[in-house]
């Protein structure tokens, strides 16, 4: 805020001050690794999202707000920052909530509680988080109460949509009849309508001319609603502050008796006990109940338009074809046929204390405890599309977690004339513990029991349980020095010890360094009014990855029944599954980043340009072993990967008047991801494990190249390959006159050549309008349904209309 000077005259008993926004406000303060700093002092690559941006996207999951940020890509619901590095170890970024590593999903955080999100992308920014920062860091800062009167805020929205499968078109009754007859004619079983009994089920014959049932259209084109309601109460004085918030979200499903309900409760309290001591509690409770139904899209695609959904009495027709192997997909809507319910309870408690030891010297201690419990149960009987057994089945699984993190941060910030120094030292401990138990069985006495009375199951009972614990200890140091707001140097280190790895390999050291030059503060540019910011920066650092199962290096066994003495009785035993790997090393990542931050016309045009080059060494990989080894798989360090690319972000304010504001944000992101070395440097590919040097570690489409359809005038040539006209023509790449495994090739990858985003925000008085566009270009997608369920198959198994 800009400073204000107000004169106080004689007899004036109150003063009202309205602070005006300055270029350096909350949005210019960035959270970076256990501390905060002004954006102008940052030496690494950091992208930020404000609460305004989040509020303009009324979404259930704050992941939506991250789309469009340069360097971030959504991959199947997962967040990827600057590419994928590892094949089997985790590629997920670290989430830090109010300074504490947060192991739950972003969906468990109420978007309305968020003040800002800062995304750390380069190694100098993430190295301070060591092994957990290898895939980038997402720092979330929640809203706090502001000084003033008690405020009560309500926020809500309602969204509507349609479950539409796009342009998918299915056959009506007449088209289906013609298709069945033509298909049977081609198979030699149909010559005239007298042969219809060979092409159709009896029920279909009886319904010809009477029934034309659009199974899919009636089911999937249903309207859906999304609702969200938030209520917040907050107040603060110069000593105390509190904020209590409640949020409820509901999302309808495409299926009846299905949907998700989310409940959030937040309570933040802080109090300045002494002039030098501040304590507080931050708590977040999250409860979700999910009633799910199975994906029945394939089953609907198999339904004939000549069959009925319901019987004459209004009940569902269980077997529309009169065939026990083809059931009515609508049956799964009934809870006494199929019910799948999950409940999750999560609690996040953070106790903190801040002690001002001396001028510029502050000690912060944070202890976070996050217990969680989840319970899932499902039940379905033989009327369900998902089940073919004559008996019903019940299953239940309970999972209990108890994680805690304790970090102690000592920081020193001082300014001496033109010199600024910022020192940070951290000691951190983490503990994760999980206990789970599962039970399943068949032949429940009554559907009313569902999974709540597992003792009454009479067949195929199965019990299992597990316990997992992992720990980590870290020591962190960081120093930043700047001279005259022009030259900035940052260095950090982190030493991590992880229990997942074997003795002798548990510890790893991660250093980093960065420099920045604020060119706009040089005398030759400082007086150029249209340049508000120009900063050149470079960084280099190392991070690591140890994200494997807690006991992976020890090897595992699994149960198996076997015949030991040649008799008929099989007895339980154990056999090796994964081979012990006591020499497993840390996966390490080194990254170089060179960037330019710029701002013109007092910040109305600003942005960043970054080039980065990241190399990962000794990839953690769960390798498939040959049967002769006696093991199925083994963890190993297999090779190296590389991610390099460009990021460009541009924000502008083309129009700014008293009543109208127009903002435009553009982003561009290009990343080349490749495997550069296998465990054996002479190897260029490991087809058995899907690894190819020069290509991404996953997402590679390695298959036969289809070049068309064999035509009637190519019958002789097709016969050479054992094919005939009408079948798919596959390229004979090695030219040996036959199609075999040697004709497979790399068709492409799921990685896009580039990603772009556009955001437009217009505000007129109290009305705002926003548009968000996000696109990926150059990737190759494989649609499994197009090559299976939608493929050209005979008869009732496909009603998808194909234009040949």
Model-derived features with residue positions:
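Short, small/polar-rich motifs associated with maturation and membrane association
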Residues: 1-266, 273, 278-280, 348, ...
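Extracytoplasmic gating/loop element in the C-terminal half of outer-membrane beta-barrel translocons
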Residues: 206, 498, 776-804
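Conserved small-residue
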Residues: 153-208, 438, 636, 646, ...
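Extracellular/periplasmic, surface-exposed regions of secreted and cell-surface proteins
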Residues: 54, 91-92, 262, 268-277, ...
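Conserved C-terminal beta-signal and adjacent last beta-strands/turns
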Residues: 232, 663, 749-777
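Structural motif
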Residues: 97-98, 312, 416, 483, ...
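Acidic, glycine-rich flexible loop segments
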Residues: 189-211, 226-230, 297-332, 339
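Short aromatic-centered micro-motifs
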Residues: 95, 310, 481, 733, ...
């Amino acid at each position: 805020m800009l400073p204000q000077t107000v004169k106080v005259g004689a007899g004036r008993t109150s003063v009202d001050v309205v602070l005006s926004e300055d270029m350096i406000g909350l949005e210019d303060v960035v959270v970076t690794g256990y501390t905060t700093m002004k954006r102008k002092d940052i030496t690494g690559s950091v992208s930020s999202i404000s609460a305004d941006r989040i509020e303009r996207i009324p979404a259930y999951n704050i992941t939506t707000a991250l789309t469009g940020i340069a360097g971030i890509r959504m991959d199947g619901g997962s967040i990827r920052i600057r590419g994928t590095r590892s094949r089997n170890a985790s590629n997920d970024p670290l989430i830090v909530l109010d300074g504490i590593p947060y192991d739950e999903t972003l969906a468990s955080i109420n978007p309305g509680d968020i003040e800002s999100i800062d995304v750390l992308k380069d190694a100098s920014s993430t190295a301070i988080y060591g092994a957990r920062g290898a895939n980038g860091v997402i720092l979330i800062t929640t809203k706090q109460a502001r000084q003033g009167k008690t405020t009560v805020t309500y926020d809500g929205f309602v969204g509507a949509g349609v479950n539409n499968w796009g342009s998918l078109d299915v056959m009506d009754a007449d088209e289906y009849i013609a298709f069945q007859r033509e298909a049977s004619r081609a198979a030699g079983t149909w010559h005239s309508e007298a042969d219809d009994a060979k092409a159709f089920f009896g029920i279909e014959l009886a319904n010809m001319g009477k029934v034309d049932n659009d199974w899919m259209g009636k089911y999937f084109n249903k309207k859906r609603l999304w609702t969200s309601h938030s209520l917040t109460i907050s107040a603060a004085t110069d000593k105390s502050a509190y904020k209590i918030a409640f949020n409820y979200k509901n999302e309808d499903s495409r299926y009846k008796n299905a949907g998700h309900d989310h409940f959030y409760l937040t309570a933040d309290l802080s109090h300045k006990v002494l002039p030098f001591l501040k304590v507080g509690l931050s708590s977040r409770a999250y409860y979700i109940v999910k009633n799910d139904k199975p994906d029945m899209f394939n089953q609907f695609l198999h339904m004939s338009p000549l069959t009925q959904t319901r019987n004459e009495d209004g009940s569902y027709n269980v077997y529309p074809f009169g065939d026990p192997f083809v059931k009515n997909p609508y049956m799964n809507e009934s809870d006494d046929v199929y019910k799948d319910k999950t409940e999750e309870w999560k609690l996040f408690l953070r106790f903190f204390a801040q002690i001002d030891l001396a001028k510029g010297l502050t000690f912060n201690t944070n202890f976070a405890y996050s217990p969680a419990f989840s319970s899932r149960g499902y039940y379905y009987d033989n009327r369900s599309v998902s089940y073919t057994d004559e008996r019903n089945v019940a299953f239940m699984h309970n999972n209990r977690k108890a994680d805690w993190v304790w970090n102690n941060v000592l920081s020193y910030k001082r300014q001496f004339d033109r010199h600024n120094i910022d020192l940070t030292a951290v000691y951190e401990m983490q503990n994760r513990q999980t206990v789970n138990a599962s039970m399943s069985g068949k032949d429940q006495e009554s559907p009313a029991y569902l999974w709540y009375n597992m003792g009454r199951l009479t067949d195929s009972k199965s019990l299992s349980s597990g316990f997992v614990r992992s720990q980590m200890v870290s020591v962190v140091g960081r120093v930043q020095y700047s001279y005259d707001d022009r030259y900035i140097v940052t260095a950090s280190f982190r030493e991590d010890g992880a229990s997942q790895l074997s003795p002798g390999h548990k510890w790893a050291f991660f250093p980093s360094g960065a420099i920045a030059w604020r060119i706009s503060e040089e005398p030759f540019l400082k007086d150029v009014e249209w340049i508000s910011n120009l900063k050149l920066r470079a960084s280099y650092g190392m991070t690591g990855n140890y994200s494997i199962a807690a006991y992976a290096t020890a090897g595992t066994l699994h149960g198996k029944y076997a015949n030991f003495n040649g008799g008929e009785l099989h007895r339980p035993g154990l056999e090796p599954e994964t081979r012990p790997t006591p020499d497993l090393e840390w996966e390490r990542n080194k990254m170089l980043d060179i960037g330019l931050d710029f701002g013109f016309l007092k910040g109305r045009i600003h942005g960043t340009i970054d080039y980065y080059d990241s190399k990962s060494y000794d990839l953690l990989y769960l390798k498939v072993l040959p049967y002769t080894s006696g093991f199925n798989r083994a963890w190993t360090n297999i090779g190296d990967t590389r991610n390099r690319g460009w990021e460009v972000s541009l924000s502008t304010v083309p129009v700014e008047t008293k009543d109208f504001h127009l903002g435009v944000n553009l982003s561009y992101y290009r990343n080349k991801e490749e495997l550069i070395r296998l465990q054996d440097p002479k190897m260029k590919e490991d087809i058995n494990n899907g690894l190819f040097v020069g290509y991404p570690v996953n997402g590679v489409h390695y298959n036969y190249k289809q070049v068309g359809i064999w035509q009637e005038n190519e019958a002789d040539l097709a016969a050479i390959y054992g094919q005939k006209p009408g079948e798919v023509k596959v390229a004979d790449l090695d030219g040996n006159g036959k199609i075999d495994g040697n004709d497979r090739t790399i068709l492409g990858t799921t990685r896009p050549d580039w990603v772009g985003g556009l955001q437009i925000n217009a505000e007129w008085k109290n009305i705002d309008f926003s548009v968000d566009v996000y696109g990926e270009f150059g990737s190759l997608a494989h649609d499994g349904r197009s090559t299976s369920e939608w493929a050209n198959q005979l008869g009732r198994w496909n009603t998808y209309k194909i234009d040949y």
